[in-house]
Amino acid sequence: MLHLRYEYLLAIVKAIVTLLSVVTIGAYMSFFERRLLGLFQHRYGPNRVGWGGSLQLLADTIKILFKEDWIPPFADRIIFTLAPIIAFTSLLLVFAIMPISPNWVVIELNIGILFFLMMAGISVYAILLGGWSSNNKYSLLGAMRAAAQTLSYEVFLGLSIMGVVAQAGSFNISTIVADQTHIWNIVPQFFGFITFYLAGLAICHRHPFDQPESEQELADGYHIEYSGMKFGLFFIGEYISLVTISALTITLFFGGWQGPWLPPYIWFIIKTTVFIIIFILIRAALPRPRYDQVMILGWTICLPLTLMNLLVTAIVILYNT
């Protein structure tokens, strides 16, 4: 009985520490991205608040908390309020199944991959609800774009993961990490990695797949009517999705927490940070394509590539058995 209580207490502590850390990192990503973009573009970036801009997060937090939390009179108040909460929560919960080290995972799910895909699907509902409840044509158009893009690229995301799942013989993310002891999945699943990363960019609505929020066409898309902390939940949620996709990329294709000499959680942090920097570098380097070009890329290149990768993986597994 005492041992059972200890396990429950440990699980609660893990959950609180992990989720608070992810929220803090997601909030701090705004400053980190602006500083990196400034470095890439030979300018300073935010450097006025604190030493080297280190207190910029505090300034942004104070600003967003004291902004008027305004709800348009023509909006559906209940759905308008629920949408950012659903988006933020669904993206945050994905980290509960992420193995940060051999002994640090909040929830050990045998259907971890399916749980991730389910949470990614729920975030689409939040975007649609937010765009529709705003009763604004630009919000609705942005929400429809986001839903179509996310649902399309979720197909490629799921198919690209299936090759990894077939190799490991499990949907459990910890098992997938353990299966990469001798060789990382980036080698046998290179095309799966490419499509997964592209689909991850699209699902996060990150540049160059940020058409749902394009300022020139849709005046910031589905969250145009949001302000205050409601906008903050959408804003931080997008950065949490960036961290989540980066963490999932290294977990599925780059051995997760595995590495020599350093502690496992340090390897997890280093690898995740590298892919976050790559995400930001892509934003600094690439132009934004048209919306139809994004959809054509998905259905004419990503889909055949994922199907080919899955077919080759199945043939190799059958041959080896």
UniProtKB/Swiss-Prot annotation:
Keywords in UniProt for this one?
Cell membrane, Membrane, NAD, Quinone, Translocase, Transmembrane, Transmembrane helix, Ubiquinone
Molecular functions (GO terms): NADH dehydrogenase activity; oxidoreductase activity, acting on NAD(P)H, quinone or similar compound as acceptor; quinone binding
Q: What class of enzyme is it?
A: translocase
Reaction equations catalysed: a quinone + NADH + 5 H(+)(in) = a quinol + NAD(+) + 4 H(+)(out)
**Record GO biological process:** aerobic respiration
Transmembrane residues, as ranges? 9-29, 78-98, 111-131, 156-176, 183-203, 234-254, 262-282, 296-316
User: One GO cellular component from the entry?
Assistant: plasma membrane
Topology of the protein relative to the lipid bilayer: Multi-pass membrane protein
Q: Which EC number(s) are documented for this chain?
A: 7.1.1.-
Entries under Pfam families matching the protein: NADHdh
Instruction: Tell me the NCBIfam families matching this sequence.
Output: PRK06076.1-1, PRK06076.1-2
**Assembly information from the UniProt record:** NDH-1 is composed of 14 different subunits. Subunits NuoA, H, J, K, L, M, N constitute the membrane sector of the complex.
Q: Which HAMAP family match?
A: NDH1_NuoH
What does this protein do, in the record's words? NDH-1 shuttles electrons from NADH, via FMN and iron-sulfur (Fe-S) centers, to quinones in the respiratory chain. The immediate electron acceptor for the enzyme in this species is believed to be ubiquinone. Couples the redox reaction to proton translocation (for every two electrons transferred, four hydrogen ions are translocated across the cytoplasmic membrane), and thus conserves the redox energy in a proton gradient. This subunit may bind ubiquinone.
Q: Which family does it belong to?
A: Belongs to the complex I subunit 1 family.
Q: What is this protein called?
A: NADH-quinone oxidoreductase subunit H
